[in-house]
C-alpha cells in the first residue's frame, strides 16, 4: 500500500506499508526533495526494519495462561487468557530475553462473565514494557449455592 503527496512547503511525502514473513511495517517519509528520494528513503526504512526486527506471536486467543481463585462461585477457579492474540515486534535475536508477568485482580467474586477483564499480562524486554494486554475470563462462572456463598463470605472476612 502506498500513499503519496507533495507540496512546495512540505516536499515529497510517502506512507508505505509492506508485509514479509508475517511482519507488517509502515514507513512515513516527509519532506524529501524528489520522487526518487522519497522512494529510496522509504525502501531504506523497510529494509532496515525487516533486517533488524522480527515479530513473534507470544500467546494465542483462548489459551489458558493462569487460573484465579473465584469467591462465591459455582467453581473455585476461573481460567484466564486473552481475547485476541498477543504479538511483539523486537530486535532480532532477543526473543529469549523476553519476560512476561501476570497480574490478577484480588478477590474476584462471582458471577463472572466470559471475556470479563480480571487482570493483565505485561511483556518486557529488559526494562522496557513492549506489550500489555488484559487477561479475561475464558468461561462464565455463575454464583455458587447459598451454602457456598456463606462459606466464602466467612473466609473472605478472615483474609
Task: Describe each model-derived feature in a short phrase.
Residues 4-159:
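Domain-terminus/edge residues, biased toward the C-terminal soluble/receptor-binding domains
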Amino acid at each position: 500500500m502506498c500513499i503519496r503527496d507533495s507540496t512546495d512547503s512540505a516536499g515529497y511525502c510517502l506512507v508505505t506499508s509492506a508485509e514479509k514473513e508475517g511482519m507488517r511495517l509502515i514507513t512515513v517519509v516527509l519532506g524529501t526533495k524528489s520522487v526518487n528520494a522519497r522512494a529510496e528513503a522509504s525502501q531504506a526504512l523497510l529494509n532496515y526494519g525487516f533486517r533488524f526486527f522480527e515479530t513473534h506471536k507470544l500467546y494465542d486467543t483462548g489459551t489458558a495462561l493462569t487460573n484465579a481463585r473465584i469467591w462465591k462461585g459455582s467453581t473455585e477457579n476461573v481460567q484466564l487468557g486473552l481475547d485476541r492474540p498477543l504479538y511483539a515486534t523486537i530486535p532480532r535475536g532477543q526473543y529469549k530475553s523476553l519476560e512476561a508477568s501476570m497480574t490478577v485482580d484480588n478477590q474476584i467474586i462471582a458471577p463472572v462473565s466470559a471475556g470479563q477483564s480480571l487482570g493483565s499480562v505485561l511483556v518486557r524486554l529488559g526494562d522496557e514494557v513492549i506489550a500489555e494486554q488484559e487477561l479475561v475470563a475464558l468461561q462464565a462462572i455463575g454464583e455458587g449455592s447459598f451454602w457456598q456463598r456463606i462459606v466464602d463470605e466467612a473466609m473472605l472476612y478472615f483474609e
